[in-house]
């Protein structure tokens, strides 16, 4: 796949223009490798749904056995801690309902480690970050 650096699209709100993209990473509690097969696919669907409900745009995503990478776009009104909480909290609740076997490995009731990493993305770094996220499974 060829990646070309393109100017990022400016989005418009009422009285402002913006371009906010983030690379968000978080891990499964205790780094247990439980996000595989249909569980990983289900998580992708759940995260896309939660993102849409919260006005976030998922640009690309990769679910690894013990962590998640998201490249997403947000609006200036969306506080980072709020949308991270929405993504992690709602996804954990929905995953435990959809895949009750997760509770066997994650006996404490938490799917996610409480911490996360978030990085800003610019038009100079977007293609590189997108390539990095999409190539995660190649590294296994």
Swiss-Prot record:
The cofactor remark states: Mg(2+), Mn(2+) and Cd(2+) support DNA cleavage whereas Ca(2+) and Zn(2+) do not.
Stimuli inducing this protein:
Transposition of this element is induced approximately 100-fold by 10 kGy gamma irradiation and approximately 50-fold by 600 J/m(2) of UV irradiation, both of which damage DNA. It rarely transposes without irradiation. Both excision and insertion of ISDra2 are increased by irradiation, transposition occurs in irradiated cells, probably triggered by single-stranded DNA formed during genome reassembly, and is not due to specific induction of TnpA expression.
Q: What Pfam families does the database record attribute to this sequence?
A: Y1_Tnp
- InterPro entries recorded for this chain? Transposase_17, Transposase_17_sf
Instruction: Summarize where Mg(2+) binds, as residue positions.
Output: 67, 69, 136
Q: According to the UniProt record, where is the region Mobile alpha helix? A: 127-133
ATP-binding as a keyword? no
**Description of how the protein assembles with itself and partners:** Homodimer.
Protein name per its UniProtKB record:
ISDra2 transposase TnpA
**Species of provenance:** Deinococcus radiodurans (strain ATCC 13939 / DSM 20539 / JCM 16871 / CCUG 27074 / LMG 4051 / NBRC 15346 / NCIMB 9279 / VKM B-1422 / R1)
Taxonomy-wise, where does this protein's organism fall, top ranks first?
Bacteria, Thermotogati, Deinococcota, Deinococci, Deinococcales
Which gene is the coding source of this polypeptide chain? Answer: tnpA
